[in-house]
């Protein structure tokens, strides 16, 4: 199968191969042809058309039999992809079996073909995304446990705050992955449904056979049968797009964190290295976060596409003019971008390179200031909150002004040494002893992940 991709220079970077195949032109055409073949089988099952007509129709429902370029030219005149495809399908069937041709597309409308074909593609896309999310969850769970007790500087407003652990940070990424997997599972039965309403949504052309055909068609395609056709009720697709937007944003957060940890000034965590990866055309020393860039790019691009899906919701009456058309490329583009981000997230997370020694050195860049809160909390129990806070604030200012370690300044303060022994001060200024519930958060995130897998 030849993939007619939109941008071969960049697709390998921004799109996973599996998703590119789902949404290539042949994939679109095959989805629509699968609808037509299933429609014939369903109508024969309920006695609406002869059983003998099914085989000629089904045999013609292979995307490889059609000239995609010619279909593309015809779409520009027809206004949608189903019209020229159904004409080509009928012509091909008639060349082999003139009697069977009359039963093609019976009772359906173009949007039935296109929407159901899209749902069949979305089912494949959903399976790919869910599998990658599950795999990413496994990787992050392992990494969170591996680094559960490794301290690094917590950063708020891009400045050192109090110590956290790398495992806790990774557990945060894991929690988002788990929630997004839960969202996909919840929307799946709403999303994977048949579109079948005929001209204006009533299936009047099929008379008393309408519901039996609809039920049989849904069964043939292994899709749910909705309470009614949804030609201009697009919330199902928009909900899917919105969840993909959440996934892109969550992956963007992961990419942003890693890229910041890779900065020269931090140099604590790195993407896996490989020959030719992350280099510069002019600077031999560079090690750029090329994987994180894809995650951040997707998180930047997808929200605008999701907004397009939301903007296309108020569709007119029983068939939309233009708003439906706005979805055609938008949802596939969202799927492509999320697939590429997931691909890179897996590569980055699996090969994460960690410099724990650098983390420890960075924790001490402020010479103990990141642990001022730890001292203040204990001192407050003995001197009162306001007194303790004011005293520590003055000591911190003095440490900065004099370029000294906070531990040394505290040792010079009689009011503090009267309350805290040298051993207590040493312990309070040890990052490993001020990690709070960091390990608990890791355990809870990992437990929730594996509970979802059970």
Feature roles, as predicted:
Residues 215-231:
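A short, charged helix-loop
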Residues 233-268, 276-335:
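A conserved active-site cap/scaffold subdomain adjacent to cofactor or substrate pockets
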Residues 301-385, 391:
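Long, amphipathic alpha-helical stalk/connector segments used for oligomerization, subunit docking
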Residues 145-167, 269-279, 285-286, 317-326, ...:
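Glycine-rich cofactor-pocket loops
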Residues 121, 168, 238-246, 374-382:
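Short, well-ordered beta-strand elements within core beta-sheets of diverse protein domains
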Residues 104, 224-229, 270, 307-318, ...:
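A glycine-rich, basic-preceded beta-loop-alpha segment at the flavin cofactor/substrate interface
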Residues 2-204, 209-214, 277-280, 290-296, ...:
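A helix-coil-helix interface module used to build multimeric assemblies
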Residues 51-54, 266-273, 343-362, 389, ...:
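A glycine-biased, small/acidic residue-tolerant capping/turn segment at secondary-structure junctions
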